[in-house]
UniProtKB/Swiss-Prot annotation:
InterPro entries: Ribosomal_bS18, Ribosomal_bS18_sf. The lineage of its organism: Bacteria, Bacillati, Chloroflexota, Chloroflexia, Chloroflexales. Belongs to the bacterial ribosomal protein bS18 family. Part of the 30S ribosomal subunit. Forms a tight heterodimer with protein bS6. Coiled coil: none annotated. GO terms for cellular component: cytosolic small ribosomal subunit. This is Small ribosomal subunit protein bS18B. Gene3D superfamilies: Ribosomal protein S18 (4.10.640.10). It comes from Roseiflexus sp. (strain RS-1).
Length: 90
């Protein structure tokens, strides 16, 4: 493969198709409402620093992302989740 052909095709050994679309974990488990008490599931949608991850990182659908945000904020208010990470506080 010449250098010009490699550049046009995206390089040597590149995948022909894009990355696979992520499936919403709440839709896959048929969960209608995100529960603020389900801390393990909420932590999967948060960064190490305690920030809420965007949809493009988690693969959650728009409906569940809105309810996920509310659930995380409720869990923070009830002291089930931290507002910031422990290493940042000290």
């Amino acid at each position: 493969m010449t250098e010009d052909q490699a550049r046009r095709s995206g390089g040597v050994g590149r995948r022909r198709f894009g990355a696979r679309r992520k499936v919403c974990m709440f839709c896959a488990d048929q969960i209608r409402v995100v529960d603020y008490k389900d801390v393990k599931r909420l932590q999967r949608c948060m960064s190490e620093r305690g920030k809420i991850l965007p949809r493009r990182r988690t693969g959650v659908c728009a409906r569940h992302q809105r309810s996920l945000t509310v659930a995380i904020k409720r869990a923070r208010h009830m002291a089930l989740l931290p507002f910031v990470a422990a290493h940042i506080r000290s």
